[in-house]
Amino acid sequence: MNNSKDNPFCGAIARKARIYLREGLDCVYFLNKAGQAESCPACTSLVFQGKTCEEHKYNNNLLSWQAVRQLERQMPQLQSSN
């Protein structure tokens, strides 16, 4: 599953993801096409090998831990307004 040849940013994405995991995230998150945070347990285990899963191989929209925390804070507000 070494996809660094396909996406030149894959190694950089994996390095950033490792930093975010060390800063407190429990999982790697990407922004999906609908603009929502999407966790990826497969990427979470692969980033320590410098890789991402096949599904996220071309998704450079890695979410930082700050962005994930901000989205988590907004979720109860969005759910209570429905």
UniProtKB/Swiss-Prot annotation:
Keyword Transmembrane helix: no
Transmembrane parts of this sequence: none
Alphabetized UniProt keyword annotations: Eukaryotic host gene expression shutoff by virus, Host gene expression shutoff by virus, Host-virus interaction, Inhibition of host innate immune response by virus, Interferon antiviral system evasion, Viral immunoevasion
Pfam families listed in its UniProt record: Acc5b_avian_CoV
Highest taxon, organism lineage: Viruses
InterPro entries listed in its UniProt record: Acc_prot_5b_avian_CoV (IPR008458)
Protein's GO biological process: symbiont-mediated suppression of host gene expression; symbiont-mediated suppression of host innate immune response
Function: Involved in host translation shutoff without degradating host RNA. By suppressing host gene expression, facilitates the evasion from host type I interferon immune response.
Name of the protein: Host translation inhibitor 5b
